[in-house]
A protein has these predicted regions:
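Immediate post-signal peptide segment of exported/extracytoplasmic ligand-binding proteins
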Residues: 30-37, 124-126
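Amphipathic alpha-helical segments that line or abut small-molecule/effector binding pockets
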Residues: 15, 25, 43, 47-59, ...
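C-terminal regulatory
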Residues: 77, 89-173, 178, 182-203, ...
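A late-sequence structural motif
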Residues: 197-235
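Central regulatory/effector-binding core of bacterial HTH transcription factors
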Residues: 34-92
Length: 235
């Protein structure tokens, strides 16, 4: 076991060294003349939230260049790298700042909404397949708040990203939990409609994750803009 722990520490040091080598120019100006900050994100966050706000985050006129790195694992952080990760925060050896709160609410396509009627009971939703965003935790939490217990059905489906879950719901595959405000723009574009008024807080949130210690001015600017965009999305 000791050798395994030593191996993990060695791998972490190698990962950090490679990140520092890759970022050897730090947030220095490149050929485009802008400070570059690399942001590690999961693909669904890049699609649903970060990319639509990229121009605003880079400034007007642009004074930052944001390079997204799609990664499902915790990437090595440096003077030129931050990450945005979903969870409860409090990760060791890093600084994590929550970006926005999320509310979970059931949404479906128009056909299912019509079949359910204008005022369905929470139990009525269980007649349809439930669509999960990566795990069953969201639906378990929502149903518990309605005094119901989640029992998995063979027709339920799990998708690896929130964007995919919403697309599946829009195609009529079942009912998904929209994560508001995170996926609000997407479910509006897809024509999804609410099928129950109850909104339950999501215990997980996206966090801005940076390494401990002083931060480069470009990273500070980006964090301030991320927080500003987050406030606007919740307004």
């Amino acid at each position: 076991m000791r050798a395994t722990l030593d191996g993990e520490r060695f791998a972490a040091r190698i990962e950090l060294a490679m990140a520092m080598l890759h970022d050897s120019r730090g947030t220095g100006r490149s050929d485009h003349g802008l400070d570059t900050v690399r942001v590690g994100v999961v693909q669904s966050f890049a699609r649903l939230w970060l990319t639509p706000r990229l121009a605003a985050l880079e400034g007007t006129p642009p004074d930052l260049r944001i390079e997204m790195e799609i990664d499902n694992a915790h990437m090595a952080l440096s003077d030129a790298r931050i990450a945005i990760r979903l969870g409860r925060g409090g990760w060791p050896n890093v600084v994590s700042e929550p970006l926005f709160d999320e509310g979970l609410q059931p949404f479906a396509c128009q056909k299912i909404a019509v079949e359910l009627g204008p005022d369905p009971a929470a139990r009525d939703l269980l007649r349809y397949p439930l669509i999960h965003d990566a795990s069953e935790a969201g639906w378990r939490r929502w149903l518990t708040a309605q005094d119901l217990v989640y029992h998995p059905k063979g027709s339920d489906r799990t998708f690896g990203g929130h964007d995919l879950a919403l697309i599946a719901a829009a195609s009529g595959m079942g009912i998904a939990l929209a994560r508001k405000p995170y996926g609000s723009e997407q479910h509006e574009r897809l024509g999804l409609v609410s099928v129950h008024p109850a909104v339950v807080d999501n215990v997980e949130r996206f966090h801005i994750v940076t390494r401990s210690g002083a931060r480069h001015g470009a990273i500070e600017r980006l964090i301030q803009r991320l927080q500003s965009q987050a406030r606007q999305s919740q307004a």
